[in-house]
Amino acid sequence: MQWETVIGLEIHAQLSTQSKIFSGSATTFGAEPNTQASLVDLGMPGTLPVLNAEAVRMACKFGLAIDAEIAEKNVFARKNYFYPDLPKGYQTSQMDHPIVGKGHLDITLEDGSTRRIGITRAHLEEDAGKSLHEDFHGMSGIDLNRAGTPLLEIVSEPDIRSAKEAVAYVKAIHALVRYLGICDGNMAEGSLRCDCNVSVRPKGQAEFGTRAEIKNVNSFRFIEKAINHEVQRQIELIEDGGKVVQETRLYDPNKDETRSMRSKEEANDYRYFPCPDLLPVVIEQSFLDEVRASLPELPGQKRERFEREFGLSTYDASVLSASREMADYFEQVNATCGDAKLAANWVMGELSSLLNKEGLDIEQSPVTAEQLGGMILRIKDDTISGKIAKMVFEAMAAGEGSADEIIEKKGLKQVTDSGAIEAMLDEVLAANAEQVEQYRASDEAKRGKMFGFFVGQAMKASKGKANPGQVNQLLKKKLEG
């Protein structure tokens, strides 16, 4: 039997406000445990919450960016459950009146195709604290610094059909919230966390299968692995005559498996009711107009512009627009060198490879955009070849100066004098007279393979400095003359 995977994602984005959603406590990551938890965060008797206006603004920004309707009237609700790191015994969230209604987001897949994923809603809520296990023997500690940190929970429609699509969607959300400046997207620190709702059904069946929810997956790689494992588990279970149970599961990256945590709760298990301490929030059109005017060029808009203005492929444009910093860097390189395709190749190739190897973000690049653009200019005017350019790039990354300084200091200027190249080629051919005879006696197919040998010898003789185009042209003329 052929199976179809059905996936819906719930993404929790920590909003980049300076203070918590209902108190003035700081939201700085990494502070000493329980040093950023106020009486309001702890739910002490007599304390009252005050809504953070900046959190509302950030939620509206997101809603406008996904073309969603922003609710004029917002109501906060209490979600009641017990957990050690939930000091009040309830979480202040939104249920029937979320701030952001239905919207959508277009994602780009690896083959360059695009898919539209529906977004059911996005609502504001407060984060819980954190349980600590490492420093306690036989016990758990509780750090309430995170309690009350503003979250935007983004709930997708069950439109996703594979683990790769799920990763593409999370990457698109990650890029969007960073472009908007509402979340830093740091998954390692828990700023962006993902719950994956996964089910399978026979291909062609309209009715959904029973879903399992995989909680708090915190990396793109783990999202793909967790979903693939859960899909395989469910298919094998059904084909063996079993039934999928609706439950919450946890992904263990060390064992590459999901395991059961608890039975999955329904909304009525949480006994939602309107929060009596918070009045309904009314959002006026003038406020939305102000927020809309502050929106930057969004990732999808930037990708389309890169394709339209610079003639880049959908894939290249998607990679370069994935982060605001990467897009800005690429545009600065292009502004310096005036060749978008060469700029794209170097940013996506050598530069990205260097950053990955050194574990750096683009903002920490040892090669500035102006330096890289200047080096590409030297390729364009034939001062250096592409091969020599890689040596120049490495030297720039090591802090040895600009491209021009390195070329001058190391004597890397390309040989373009046709007379000098011809003399060098004559020496190469004389030293390989036997291969020359074989070449001239061969058919076209063999000649093509042998030609690369002569080019290699010529570039070796010139220490990579001879202009490759001229070498190819003059070599062909001499071999066939």
From Swiss-Prot:
PROSITE patterns the record matches: GATB
UniProt xrefs under SMART domains: GatB_Yqey (SM00845)
EC number: 6.3.5.-
Domain of life where this protein originates: Bacteria
Keyword Ligase: yes
Cysteines engaged in disulfide bonds, as pairs: none
Transmembrane feature ranges: none
Keyword presence, Hydrolase: no
Keywords: ATP-binding, Ligase, Nucleotide-binding, Protein biosynthesis
GO molecular function ontology, one term from the record: glutaminyl-tRNA synthase (glutamine-hydrolyzing) activity
Leader sequence residues: none
Enzyme's top EC category: ligase
Catalyses which reaction(s): L-glutamyl-tRNA(Gln) + L-glutamine + ATP + H2O = L-glutaminyl-tRNA(Gln) + L-glutamate + ADP + phosphate + H(+); L-aspartyl-tRNA(Asn) + L-glutamine + ATP + H2O = L-asparaginyl-tRNA(Asn) + L-glutamate + ADP + phosphate + 2 H(+)
GO annotation terms (biological process): glutaminyl-tRNAGln biosynthesis via transamidation; translation
Function: Allows the formation of correctly charged Asn-tRNA(Asn) or Gln-tRNA(Gln) through the transamidation of misacylated Asp-tRNA(Asn) or Glu-tRNA(Gln) in organisms which lack either or both of asparaginyl-tRNA or glutaminyl-tRNA synthetases. The reaction takes place in the presence of glutamine and ATP through an activated phospho-Asp-tRNA(Asn) or phospho-Glu-tRNA(Gln).
Quaternary structure and interacting proteins, as annotated: Heterotrimer of A, B and C subunits.
PANTHER family according to UniProt: GLUTAMYL-TRNA GLN AMIDOTRANSFERASE SUBUNIT B MITOCHONDRIAL AND PROKARYOTIC PET112-RELATED, GLUTAMYL-TRNA(GLN) AMIDOTRANSFERASE SUBUNIT B, MITOCHONDRIAL
Sequence similarity: Belongs to the GatB/GatE family. GatB subfamily.
Name by which UniProt lists this protein: Aspartyl/glutamyl-tRNA(Asn/Gln) amidotransferase subunit B
Source organism per UniProt: Stutzerimonas stutzeri (strain A1501)
Record lineage: Bacteria, Pseudomonadati, Pseudomonadota, Gammaproteobacteria, Pseudomonadales
Underlying gene: gatB
